[in-house]
Amino acid sequence: PDQREEMYRAIRKFRSTKAIFTLDFQNDAEFVHGCIAGGRRYLHINANGDVDPCVFIHYSNANIYENTLLEALKSPIFMAYHDGQPFNENMLRPCPMLENPKLLREMVNKTGAKGTNAEAEETVEHLCSKCDHYAEEWGPVADRIWAEQKHKKAPYENYTEEKREHPELAAFEHADGSDGLRDEDLQ
């Protein structure tokens, strides 16, 4: 937690003193309003064709050789990601594995997603047990830092209707409730 806080402050200092925008993968979720994985803005397809929610989270219900991309995005693990976003209102705690391991356990167990790491498959319990201590230690530090800062509201939220801060954004959905994507557009 101390190193991460130091990195958070150093990156912001660089941005205010240098003519460059540096991106901090762990601490910049506020710029994309949370975790980008699970098909929200990103997904991972491994060499075997398994469609994982994230390069760091090797659990899947779909394989690109057997399913269309749209089918994979509608698979149980991806829908759990969709329904669970944001995983934390504190954007310094966006990840369902690292900062909210209880949520990843729940999603994998609820959806029946299977491990896809061909080199070192591990249960979700084993993976998340490696993150529990860090999440407990980082949580209070992240909450303190988050409370110190002002935050802009996101101009766009692709969360479930119940989790939107801006209900008026629902107007961008199609009248039938779909997102307008068709299977044939993604094949």
Language-model features, listed with the residues they occupy:
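Flexible mid-to-C-terminal extensions adjoining Fe-S/redox cofactors in radical SAM and related proteins
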Residues: F56-Q187
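A structure-centric signal for secondary-structure junctions around beta-strands
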Residues: G39-R40, N48, E89-L92
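Radical SAM enzyme [4Fe-4S]-AdoMet core and its adjacent flexible, acidic
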Residues: P1-G38, A47-N48, D52, F56-N67
